[in-house]
Design a protein with these regions (language model features):
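C-terminal catalytic histidine-bearing segment of alpha/beta-hydrolase fold enzymes
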Residues: 215, 222-252
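Mobile cap/lid helix-loop segments that gate and shape the active-site cleft of serine hydrolases
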Residues: 154-190, 196
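N-terminal cap/lid segment of alpha/beta-hydrolase-fold proteins
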Residues: 2-43
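Alpha/beta-hydrolase active-site loop
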Residues: 94-114
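Short substrate-entry loop that stabilizes the transition state in hydrolases
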Residues: 45-47, 52-91, 154
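Short glycine-enriched nucleophile-adjacent loop
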Residues: 128-139
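Short beta-strand/loop motif that positions the catalytic acidic residue
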Residues: 194, 200-202, 206
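Alpha/beta-hydrolase fold nucleophile elbow
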Residues: 114-125
């Protein structure tokens, strides 16, 4: 019996928005109990689903309740997996290794709380890898947004000196030693399997995820004849100023 995406338990979680209900969810993913945060508008409605895929690594870049409540307030049911090994979840964070299935199975969690069979993907930073793999491994995604998203795991290792120690430990070495493990985490070579339109949002002065990740993703998608749109913000870095961030979310 396949229990992937089956909810084990839920508990109320403090919400920063009086119009949005939050619950922490434990669900099955590849035999592991993984945690995530669910945000639902309190006003009843026929909402579409949004899978929010966080950035960072392990405890860095953890899901922020205010962020997913912001999307729920726009009229979505939002589910944000923490990924395995985080916040008491079983397994270990693998930086888009087997933990990509925590995102894939997160779609099944989301579908249990929406009436429309419409699920959209949103990924930030490392979440860019996760949204692309989810769209590659599923055929029921309606749209994809990758914001300041990673598209090349090898490039991330070389660009982020501060992450090298953690990545070597998680992946099992550097790209010179185990190049195939970084290539296997890089979705650029599999984008032919993506069937949903992709929106790429990126600041040209991003020092955490170089703009080249966006350029390469756009190039590979167009090379496969996929529908892709780009919003490049000149002069902006990894995190947009709050007002512009809100305006961008409202445009989505």
């Amino acid at each position: 019996m396949n229990d992937n995406g089956k909810v084990v338990s839920m508990r109320p979680y403090p919400s920063p928005n009086s119009y949005v209900r939050l619950d922490e969810v434990i669900y099955w993913s590849q035999g592991l109990r993984v945690k995530g945060l669910l945000a639902r508008p309190k006003v009843p409605g026929d909402y579409e689903g949004l899978l929010y895929l966080r950035g960072g690594l392990q405890s860095i870049g953890m899901v922020r309740p205010a962020r997913i409540a912001q999307f729920a307030a726009q009229g979505f049911v939002v589910f944000a997996p923490y990924y395995r090994g985080n916040r008491g979840g079983e397994g270990k964070d693998e930086f888009a290794g087997e933990d990509r299935f925590d995102a894939v199975n997160g779609v099944e969690v989301l579908k249990q709380f929406i009436q429309k069979e419409k699920v959209h993907l949103f990924g930030f930073s490392r979440g860019g890898l996760m949204v692309l793999w989810t769209a590659i491994l599923r055929n029921d995604i309606k749209s994809i947004v990758t914001w300041a998203g990673v598209s090349d795991a090898t490039a991330t290792y070389w660009e982020r000196v501060d992450m090298r120690r953690g990545l070597k430990r998680i992946v099992g070495g550097n790209p010179n030693k185990v190049p195939e493990r970084y290539e296997n985490r890089t979705p650029l070579y599999e984008v032919a399997k993506i069937n949903a339109p992709v929106l790429i949002i990126h600041g040209t002065e991003d020092q955490h995820v170089d703009i080249e990740h966006a350029y390469q993703l756009e190039k590979h998608l167009k090379g496969e004849g996929k529908t892709v749109e780009t919003w490049f913000s000149y002069g902006l870095k990894h995190h947009f100023p709050p007002k512009l961030n809100r305006m961008t979310v409202q445009r989505l």
